[in-house]
Swiss-Prot record:
Record field: catalytic activity: N(6)-hydroxy-L-lysine + L-glutamate + ATP = 1-L-glutamo-2-N(6-)L-lysinohydrazine + AMP + diphosphate + 2 H(+)
InterPro entries in alphabetical order: Cupin_2, GPI/OXD, RmlC-like_jellyroll, RmlC_Cupin_sf
Result of changing residue 28 to A: No impact on hydrazine bond formation
Cofactor(s) demanded: Zn(2+)
Entries under Pfam families matching the protein: Cupin_2 (PF07883)
Record note on what altering residue 26 to A does: No impact on hydrazine bond formation
Name the record gives this protein: Cupin 2 conserved barrel domain-containing protein
Span list, region Cupin 2 conserved barrel: 55-119
Record entry for activity regulation: Inhibited by 1,10-phenanthroline (OP).
């Protein structure tokens, strides 16, 4: 972790870098790491920032929620199903989901799909 101190579980950034994530294993096999910005000594952000890692051959659980969401696909490619419509997504793509849109990603390759996800309440 790139920090100068950790006090009561709060990381203090030395050089603007956030602490390394602890990824949570999801039932689908995908991994989710959430940057908990409000717990850091930085301005409280009006959004949540996360890193999603989908290993090869894994399909995420279908998701839909009140929050709006943007995905920035960093690496890999796969098949996105958005409200029942399938399309290929790949590194460099930016995706936006309005509230309650059903979305699911299948990694049909061998390399992980890495996604930066940002979500916020409407």
């Amino acid at each position: 972790m790139t920090t100068d101190s950790v006090t009561q579980g709060v990381a203090h950034s030395v050089n603007g870098r956030l602490p390394e994530l602890d990824f949570e294993n999801r039932p689908s096999g995908a991994k989710l790491g959430i940057f908990d910005l409000p717990k850091l000594e930085v301005s409280v952000a009006p959004f949540t920032l996360a890193h999603i890692r989908v290993p090869g051959g894994v399909t995420t659980a279908e998701d839909h929620h009140e929050v709006r969401e943007i995905w920035l696909v960093q690496s890999g490619s796969g098949i996105l199903t958005l409200d029942g419509v399938r399309s290929r997504v790949r590194a460099g793509d930016t995706l936006y989901y309005e509230s309650y849109r059903r979305h699911q990603l299948h990694n049909d390759g061998d390399s992980p799909v890495e996604i930066v996800s940002i979500w916020w309440r409407p």
